[in-house]
From Swiss-Prot:
It catalyses: GTP + H2O = GDP + phosphate + H(+). GO terms for biological process: positive regulation of translation. Residues 11-193 form the tr-type G domain. GTP binds at residues 23-28, 140-143. It comes from the Bacteria. One of its GO terms (molecular function) is GTP binding. It comes from Anoxybacillus flavithermus (strain DSM 21510 / WK1). This is Elongation factor 4. InterPro entries: EF-4, EFG_III/V, EFG_V-like, EFTu-like_2, G_TR_CS, LepA_C_sf, LepA_CTD, LepA_IV. HAMAP family: LepA (MF_00071). It is a peripheral membrane protein.
């Protein structure tokens, strides 16, 4: 193509994404748009066409991004090229959302006509506003009996401050309002700007690993043009590659000659390692590089850590390979080898949040058939020692001696919780219990309240979200952002079996709740660890101080069975002999800890 054709093509491109809270109908709307523009035939339409991971469809959430090129003939007779970039709505994947929004000029904001605005809708709208996107409100699910579009329209204006007078009333399920949405995309979302002849600048907004082609980078070209055979350079890492092919998704991959300004597509360059195509990085030409990269790139830091160990130790290398493969598609996943006396060899893994952690564990079991055991999730603590050194501790068993510690700081998050006002009490009680600091309370309308709390991240990683959902009958929505570190009275609790520490059962706990927590765990372990031939004390200790204890009773053989009637001294002799034997056994015996015992420490239902 020459310059004129490229510019003409650029003016007909519209790049947009869809933002919505979970379950407000984003994937269904995407399906309808694909159907309307003829991207998928009737035969190929399956629910949630863009959610290609089996797990995504099963959980009904979008984890990875997808980008599709659609062709739409508008009412003005022009043929437009629409690029729909799908975004995940879950709080763990905020960075993925911000990158996919950076690749767009506009966003469709989907709000459920019955539910109204929820916490994650807000979080994502603010990201869109930060990226200066044109936002088109769509009020979805108007076919529901409980729909109240006028109230929601008012809410969009009051809470977000968007003009919702032209908001499209739609029902993606039934197919109402889809034409209007497409027309609004064409008329209201601006065409991309940028010069097709300038030095190349392309934003990587996702990457995935293909066993045959290496890494496939999903890119949005902001300036310049890229073709097969050119040498490219990644601006964050400085590595250079040669482009093998470029193409677009219609949702299936289709090779094209070039990608130019405004295009969204993919490129392969026999890149072996996904960490070379960092999401948010800028691709430029190696021989004619751009002066500076596109803004907004940052390295993702994991927030939650846990140990993953194969149940069958022989599969250690399989686990490493599986994690490496998952890391190819998931730059946020980090792992390094670690060993534990109790569990053998495994990996310490870092995740963005809890959902991310669960999904990785589930994919290891599902896609790679590796049975794993996970230790309790923990966060990164900053430990200041009396000699002035500062440590970052992400594994409870690395916590130094209490005598050496001057203070410990833990990460805090600012949590925004939206909840119907009938449930404000239980939610505030939950936050109090989790050591929350009350920030602010605002009424959105007569029915809904936004609460702001500062909470320790460590209190959220266990079961906060589950309890929040169950205490509000599923109505609360929750979003959090990291605000920094604060000093806390934290101690490390060790669990001793038969007088020996079991490193994998250690955890860090707030001093005030240490006693209760220790008691519950000790009782739980007593029931889970099988009885031995000798009695086994189970103890919880902080430093050298034992704070809770329970005993697993010994299994005993009835040594008196042979004595009929016999003399009491004869019986006593046999019992004494048995006792001696048990004592000897106890000195040499070791205790096997079953899988469930580790799980018990994590899944403390009655945690507090």
């Amino acid at each position: 193509m020459n310059r004129e054709e490229r510019l003409k093509r650029r003016d007909r491109i519209r790049n947009f994404s869809i933002i919505a809270h979970i379950d407000h109908g984003k994937s269904t709307l995407a399906d309808r748009i694909l159907e309307k523009t003829g991207a998928l035939s009737e035969r190929e339409m399956k629910e949630q066409a863009l959610d290609s991971m089996e797990l995504e469809r099963e959980r009904g959430i979008t984890i990875k991004l997808n980008a599709v090129q659609l062709h739409y003939k508008a009412k003005d007779g022009e043929d437009y090229i629409l690029h729909l970039i799908d975004t995940p709505g879950h709080v763990d994947f905020t960075y993925e959302v911000s990158r996919s929004l950076a690749a767009c000029e506009g966003a469709i904001l989907v709000v459920d006509a019955a539910q109204g605005i929820e916490a994650q809708t807000l979080a994502n709208v603010y990201l869109a506003i930060d990226n200066n996107l044109e936002i088109l409100p769509v009020i979805n699910k108007i076919d529901l009996p409980s729909a109240d579009p006028e109230r929601v329209r008012q809410e969009i204006e009051d809470v977000i401050g968007l003009d919702a007078s032209e908001a499209v009333l739609a029902s993606a399920k039934v197919g109402i309002g889809i034409d209007e949405i497409l027309e609004q995309i064409v008329q209201k979302i601006p065409a991309p700007s940028g010069d097709p002849d300038a030095p190349l600048k392309a934003l990587i907004f996702d990457s995935l690993y293909d066993p045959y082609r290496g890494v496939v980078a999903y890119i949005r070209v902001v300036e310049g043009t890229v073709k097969a055979g050119q040498k490219i350079k990644m601006m964050a890492t400085g590595k250079e590659f040669e482009v093998v092919e470029v193409g677009v998704f219609t949702p299936k991959a289709k090779v094209v000659d070039e990608l130019t300004v405004g295009d969204v597509g993919y490129l392969t360059a026999s890149i072996k390692n996904v960490s070379d195509t960092r999401v948010g990085d800028t691709i430029t030409h190696a021989d004619n590089p751009a002066n500076e990269p596109l803004p907004g790139y940052r390295r993702l830091n994991p927030m939650v850590f846990c140990g993953l160990y194969p149940i069958d130790t022989a599969r250690y290398n399989d686990l490493r390979e599986a994690l490496e493969k998952l890391q190819l598609n998931d730059a946020a996943l980090q792992f390094e080898p670690e060993t534990s006396q109790a569990l053998g060899f495994g990996f310490r893994c870092g995740f963005l949040g809890l959902l991310h952690m669960e999904i990785i564990q589930e994919r290891l079991e599902r896609e790679f058939n590796i049975d794993i055991i996970a230790t309790a999730p923990s966060v990164v603590y900053k430990v200041y020692l009396t000699d002035g050194t500062e440590l970052a501790v992400d594994n409870p068993s690395n916590m130094p001696d209490p005598q050496k510690i001057e203070r410990v700081e833990e990460p805090y998050v600012r949590a925004t919780i939206m909840v119907p006002n009938d449930y404000v009490g239980p939610v505030m009680e939950l936050c109090q219990k989790k050591r929350g600091i009350f920030g602010d309370m605002q009424y959105l309308d007569e029915r809904r309240v936004t609460l702001t709390y500062e909470l320790p991240l460590a209190e959220i990683v266990y079961d906060f979200f589950d309890i929040l959902k169950s205490s509000t009958k599923g109505y609360a929505s929750f979003d959090y952002e990291l605000i920094g570190y604060k000093p806390s009275k934290l101690v490390k609790m060790d669990i001793l079996l038969n007088g020996e520490k079991v490193d994998a059962l250690s955890f860090i706990v707030h001093r005030d709740s240490a006693y209760d927590r220790g008691k519950v765990i000790v009782e739980k372990l007593k029931d889970l660890i099988p009885r031995q031939q000798f009695e086994v004390p189970v103890q919880a200790a902080i430093g050298n101080k034992i704070i809770a204890r329970s005993t697993i009773k010994a299994l005993r053989k009835n040594v008196l069975a042979k004595c009929y009637g016999g003399d009491i001294s004869r019986k006593r002799k046999l019992l004494e002999k048995q006792k001696e034997g048990k004592k000897r056994m106890k000195q040499v015996g070791s205790v096997e800890v079953p899988q469930e015992a580790f799980m018990a420490v994590l899944k403390m239902d009655d945690q507090k």
